[in-house]
């Protein structure tokens, strides 16, 4: 086989293994620290420094 075929196979395998970067833009987004759109937490929850919603105890009304 020609070396170019091996190179193309390697690139194709790399792209498949790195599939996280090739999601369509309209796909539901995973939680991202760098995401400019921050969804609000439910009532009695606050966002911690990891970006996750945590339930407050006790709940302030």
UniProtKB/Swiss-Prot annotation:
Name recorded for this polypeptide: U-stichotoxin-Hcr1a
Subcellular localization: Secreted; Nematocyst
Hydroxyproline modification, residue list: 36
Described function: Toxin that is lethal to crab. Does not produce the typical symptoms associated with sodium channel toxins in crabs, suggesting that it likely does not act on sodium channels.
Misc. remarks from the entry: A synonymy between H.magnifica and R.crispa is controversial.
Superkingdom per UniProt: Eukaryota
UniProtKB keywords: Disulfide bond, Hydroxylation, Nematocyst, Secreted, Signal, Toxin
Chief localisation class: secreted
Residue ranges listed under propeptide: 22-31
Disulfide bridge map: 41-53, 44-59
Family: Belongs to the Hau1a/HC18/HC19 family.
Transport listed as a keyword: no
Chain coiled-coil ranges: none
Signal peptide from the UniProt entry: 1-21
